[in-house]
Curated annotation (Swiss-Prot):
Homodimer. One of its GO terms (molecular function) is DNA binding. HAMAP family: DNA_YbaB_EbfC. Binds to DNA and alters its conformation. May be involved in regulation of gene expression, nucleoid organization and DNA protection. This is Nucleoid-associated protein SynWH7803_0026. The lineage of its organism: Bacteria, Bacillati, Cyanobacteriota, Cyanophyceae, Synechococcales. It holds the Pfam family YbaB_DNA_bd. InterPro entries: YbaB-like_sf, YbaB/EbfC. Its main location: cytoplasm. The keyword DNA-binding applies. It comes from the Bacteria.
Length: 113
């Protein structure tokens, strides 16, 4: 049968085994990312936001002095903290996915590249 260009049974079995292992590892990674708390802060550190490794918002902390500086200042600080947390969270996710896939370029949505 190998003469017809079909893979031998051993290769096919190995491919399925690897696919199952990647699926199990991906599930474990998903759980690890869900459990992570990644902090991002404004430049002055008066606004902080925590996201999971899957970019789910977890909590926000604002220094009381920030609230006395007006809405525009507070909003800018919160946005900066959110951007920082998002960048760190997506970088962590991308790094962990590369570890999982052994550096294969799978061109996954949301993973940039």
């Amino acid at each position: 049968m190998a003469g017809f260009g079909l893979p031998n049974f051993g290769q096919l079995t190995e491919a399925f085994r690897k696919a199952q292992q990647i699926q199990q590892d991906a599930q474990k990674l998903q759980e690890e990312l869900d459990a992570m708390e990644i902090e991002g802060s404004s430049e002055d550190g008066r606004a902080s936001i925590w996201l999971s490794g899957n970019q789910q918002p977890l909590r926000v902390k604002l220094d009381p002095s920030l609230l006395n500086e007006g809405q525009d200042t507070a909003e800018a600080a919160v946005l900066a903290a959110l951007q920082s947390a998002y960048e760190r969270s997506t970088a962590t996710m991308k790094e962990r996915m590369q570890d999982l896939t052994g550096g294969l370029d799978l061109n996954l949505p949301g993973m940039g590249g």
